Amino acid sequence: MDINNITAVYFVGAGGIGMSALIRYFLSKGKKVGGYDKTPSGLTEQLNYEGAAIHYEDNVDLIPDDFTDPAKTLVVYTPAVPEDHSELCYFRGNGFEVMKRARVLGEITGCNRGLCVAGTHGKTTTSSMVAHLLKQSHVDCNAFLGGILKNYDSNLMLSDKSDLTVIEADEFDRSFHWLKPYMAVITAADPDHLDIYGTPEAYRESFEHFTSLIRPDGCLLMKQSINVTPRLQEGVKFYTYTGAFDAKELSTFNFQLSTGSPDFYAENVRIGGGEIFFDFVGPDVRIPDIQLGVPVKVNIENGVAAIALAWLNGVTPEEIKHGMATFAGPRRRFDFHLKKENIVLIDDYAHHPAELKASILSVKELYAGRKVTGIFQPHLYTRTRDFAADFAASLSLLDELILLDIYPAREEPIPGVTSQIIFDAVTIADKRLIRKEELLDVVAAEAGNLEVVLMVGAGNIELLVDPVKQILDKKE
């Protein structure tokens, strides 16, 4: 099926952040768009407002007539939807073209110069930085992002003058293997999604295969410490980068490199007064006094990768400095909700032990000497089972921990796997395990003792951020 010739697109699992970018894309092309999701959300309601027709019951009778012609309708689904889903089975049994989200994204972007950002963590922020740097410059771009970029209040950007397309390359279910990168970034390859991959080795191999897809006239930019062996086609250039970030020594920025100097890096890093500045250094380029619009330490390495990709595609040093300073970040990626003298509230999407550690260390560096309280909701039973000890080690870096129940997402419970196995291994004394429904009462009771609060997780903890903010905002 030629995607350009269809008149209607139906999404099964329409509420996912990646699906929503495709929904917005097809709406912009004048297609009729509908779909199903399990639960309503602010995002699905916004998509309905923009012209989609999304319902919330798995019921074939609710599929509108606009989406019942197999010759004119494309059906897009996400791997999170179970195979026995009634609507999905209806479409498969009646001659419809049914494609995974990742394949459709690959079809849409395959003819463009794709700037694909992959990695266990850091990919949403880095791809959003790249998109903003290009969009606000003379270069311009299209973008399909995995987060709502606050500068544009969207995860989709379109351009009528540029074929550069920034793509968040998702490794879940090997989705990024459908892409055809012109340039690619790998920010991290810490094993994750072991329910899909089985072993850490298989997970890393998927990234190695991803590097083999880069066009011969393109390049790979990879964080230096990553344990991935690229399989590049002849002609593909290879660069390394680092953020000059030593997580073991909070106050020290240095390089402990075993493989030589990186091609791109930060130096002369200055942190203070809630701001971060650094100098960007690369082959034949040095840009002094870069200011991070989202001043958190982990964004130094994200920023180096984004600046390098922008510079390689013609963005000027002046445009880079302006873009980095004005970057507001994607929602739920180090998202400041309160930033007052007596209380700070940050919401972050971290849901893997490595990114959780980076988030906590970044907060402790930015607010040295102040008590940091973490409110963490584990995401998925399998991830909790596979990384319980690592989660506990990261959470033990906090001054105080409030741990919530596991958010199951697509999974059924696993016997013996609860937040308790993380809680028992956390080594700090100031910790408590509560149900999500108890959180607001706990925060209200403890508000006077809270200084810096970090709410973390990829589940529905985000629904509690505003209520927590309302409580803390009243703190004297």
Please tell me what each predicted stretch does:
Residues 8-9, 75, 115, 141, ...:
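Conserved hydrophobic helix-helix packing surfaces used for dimerization/oligomerization
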Residues 2-8, 18, 25, 29, ...:
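Nucleotide phosphate-binding/pyrophosphate-handling subdomain across enzymes
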Residues 25-31, 62-67, 79-224, 228-237, ...:
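Phosphate-binding loop of NTP-binding sites
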Residues 31-38, 220-224, 373-376, 398-408:
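Short internal beta-strands
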Residues 230, 236, 247-261, 448-449, ...:
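Short, basic, low-complexity termini and linkers enriched in Ser/Thr/Gly/Pro
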Residues 392-450:
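C-terminal helical cap/extension that packs against the catalytic core
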Residues 68-74, 163, 449-451:
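Short acidic/histidine-rich motifs immediately flanking catalytic phosphotransfer sites
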Residues 1-100, 104, 219, 250-260, ...:
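N-terminal leader/targeting and accessory segments in enzymes
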